[in-house]
Amino acid sequence: MWRIKIAEGGNNPYIYSTNNFQGRQIWVFDPNAGTPEEQAEVEEARQNFWKNRFQVKPNSDLLWQLQFLREKNFKQKIPKVKVEDGEEITSEIAAAALRRSVHLFSALQASDGHWCAENGGLLFFLPPLVFAVYITGHLNTVFSPEHRKEILRYIYCHQNEDGGWGIHIEGHSTMFCTVLNYICMRILGEARDGGIENACERGRKWILDHGGATGISSWGKTWLSILGVYEWDGTNPMPPEFWAFPSSFPLHPAKMFCYCRITYMPMSYLYGKRFVGPITPLILQIREEIYNEPYNKIKWNSVRHLCAKEDNYFPHPTIQKLLWDALYTFSEPLFSRWPFNKLREKALKITMDHIHYEDHNSRYITIGCVEKPLCMLACWIEDPHGEAFKKHLARIADYIWVGEDGIKMQSFGSQTWDTSLALQALIASDLSHEIGPTLKQGHVFTKNSQATENPSGDFRKMFRHISKGAWTFSDKDQGWQVSDCTAESLKCCLLFSMMPPEIVGEKMEPEKVYDSVNVILSLQSQNGGFTAWEPARAGSWMEWLNPVEFMEDLVVEHEYVECTSSAIQALVLFKKLYPRHRNKEIENCIINAAQFIENIQEPDGSWYGNWGICFSYGTWFALKGLAAAGRTYENCSAIRKGVDFLLKSQRDDGGWAESYLSCPKKVYVPFEGNRSNLVQTAWAMMGLIYGGQAKRDPMPLHRAAKLLINSQTDLGDFPQQELTGAFMRNCMLHYALFRNTFPIWALAEYRRHVLFPSAGFGFGFTNNL
């Protein structure tokens, strides 16, 4: 039986931590764990998911929840409530519904104070990790038979009815993910026509019917070349020499978005080495299975730019293709010959130095799941028996997640982000007298998860930004500062500082608060908006270089409405509590940030959400940020337009439901069907509350609250529905905790501001700056 372990490093000499592994969550298989009843409960969850996999594609993340509730012997004691048609929602009904969810949510807190959750749903995350451990000869040591069984379960569960796999679990089939998952099944032991319901045969048929694997997108071409089932001559150049150029060079990686930079760092190393893994009998078989012509007859140079239409969300512009052609024709032959091959050797060393630096400063977690197997493989190529590779192996467990739909690879964990939102939802409930220990533990976790140092050495030379005082998206060890994670965690600490210490613990030291504010301020751009990870270092013109066909806006850092809103909220509250610290600078920062939010509003009154689906998410953040900055419905046309957008998109059942297609299409697309999405309903509901809807006409809020209350389960949680997370326009994420966090938060705000409208928003002040 699978069990999750919290804040454990084990006895592995190759793993280390900056904060005693707080926030770390790893899964282990214990064949002796669980009673027959508990094992049956898990199996029932698996079977229920399988039967309904085409209706609700994200899993409910039940395995760890079943474990926690058993360990804490949680029983729901508060009776379920229901609002009948024509019935008024009383404070007693709202309080009962809220208390049911809050008590359950508190029982789901981990022992170190954070909340666990899956953060995944992308179907290109896991196969490269399997490829990497296969190439290095560690497949059987990293993945036990139980691991392999659950990985295959996940692949089977998320195969589309047409036989292919999408970029994400709700997406249409693509060549990229179908080829990757087909090969993954073969490596894990399935025969060419094997798998549940002939998964391999159906997957291969999809590949061949859509032109074969030569049409795989660029990341796929890279991984297939590494694996030995494609040729490097069929990929566009990724010269490591770019890392050897002065950072003033217009196309230097230092100017790129951190994820783009650190993905292409090991890719360029592998490309420069022309590395190919062992050509095993299985690799030779796969070569003959995924193409429509014999492998040795393929003209690799002619397929460099080929991309299946299903994958080609961001077609390469002609000027980009000309650049790749020039590099392929002129520079690559040059760097393979003396004396220029000496320059390549130097560039490879510089690139490897950067890989080691990033590995060290993330405790070998790396910045994310795309980069992890690439960096690990580069370290193995340099020294198969070296410490760096062994440290990478020790951190694979940080990425593995087990649900009722099988084993998947996390993006890299959302522990800090999820916890900061969960704590704010619980604080808003005004039930601190009932859940004091939960709040205290969460407060301790948040304080202990703050970064206390910048990256090591001359970090600016390594193109890194300050991190001292920041919070990451996952845990402290991962090390990468994020503006909104910092702002939301700082808000938690500031809110706790206003509460009785005997309930929530001692407040954070002022110097650490100042460090956090310093990080937030450092990430504001000249246009007033806030970036996520690093300051914007280049203009948007560089996006024409985007080599990734299925994503957009990933070459350089951009400003985001969500990050800007979070920063405003944190700084407004900080300014109230610490009015003398950088007062004028913070005041100007808030003014410019609020203006940025107004400036990027869509003509229909909405805001595009970058990290959630989509206009519902962005509009909630925008309205909350503007309200924090002192804007009101009466004095701000942007708020009036935003409120109007939300009211117009409310559905007959009182809720909201937006399709994930809004993200790639960049226009509001309603969800097909009659059912509303409860998480999006919570976002819209809170957006209306911050827009002052309660005092004008509370009926839309009553209708939304009725839907949330009546959707609550017998246990006290809320049902899993469609995906709600997003990134890079075309990739959707499963934030499994959101199904509880946001309905709780919305009901809490409804109870405070609609049923008891005298309550303030908690921003510190609401007058105009």
UniProtKB/Swiss-Prot annotation:
> What are its GO cellular component terms?
lipid droplet
Superkingdom per UniProt = Eukaryota
Its recorded reaction(s) are: (S)-2,3-epoxysqualene = lupeol
Sorted keywords for this record are: Isomerase, Repeat
Instruction: Please list the GO biological process terms of this entry.
Output: cuticle development; pentacyclic triterpenoid biosynthetic process
> SUPFAM superfamilies recorded for this chain?
Terpenoid cyclases/Protein prenyltransferases
Species of the source: Ricinus communis (Castor bean)
Q: What is this protein called?
A: Lupeol synthase
